[in-house]
Amino acid sequence: MKPTIVCFSHLRWNFTFQRPNHLMSHFARERRVFYIEEPILGASTSTIEVEVIGDGLTVCTPHLIDDSRWRAESEQARLIRAFLLEQGVENPLLWFYTPMALPLAEGIRSSAVVYDCMDELSMFLGAPPELMAREQELMTRA
């Protein structure tokens, strides 16, 4: 059986049909795919909204109470690990579209890591200062 893919993306699934949508939809024909979106902050409780897009493809949107980046990353990582455990996911292939999601995968034992760098995110207006360091770390792991 092919490993489950856990995809971390900076793009909302329903924003516009782009490379992540195309590839993850294709992969979902043969394996489970969990597409993890960036969180929505300011929720009354921390949770993961789950939307089944089709056979094998599930979009997960974390909703977080706290708006502190560090606490938000920590809480999001906890929610993702708990969700994957509930789903029986073991040794997934971790697929990243943004290096900023790297801390979210802490504690997840993976079969492989893919960094699909489709944009020069460091050139975007408002790019976080730690983006380049995380990208270098992700390149080392992939």
Language model segments and positions:
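Short His-centered aromatic/hydrophobic patch
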Residues: F96-M100
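Short, well-ordered alpha-helix to beta-strand connector turns
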Residues: K2, E30-R31, N91, S110-S111, ...
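Short loop/helix-cap segments at secondary-structure boundaries that form the rim of catalytic
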Residues: V52-I53, L102-R109
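Active-site proximal beta-strand in glycosyltransferases
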Residues: R32, W95, G107-S122
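A short, histidine- and acid-enriched strand-loop-helix "catalytic/donor-clamping" loop
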Residues: W13, L102-P103, C117-P129
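N-terminal subdomain of nucleotide-sugar transferases
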Residues: M1-S44
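A conserved catalytic-core segment of Leloir-type glycosyltransferases
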Residues: L41-N91
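Membrane-proximal helix-turn-helix segments that form the acceptor-binding/catalytic region
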Residues: L23, P128-A142
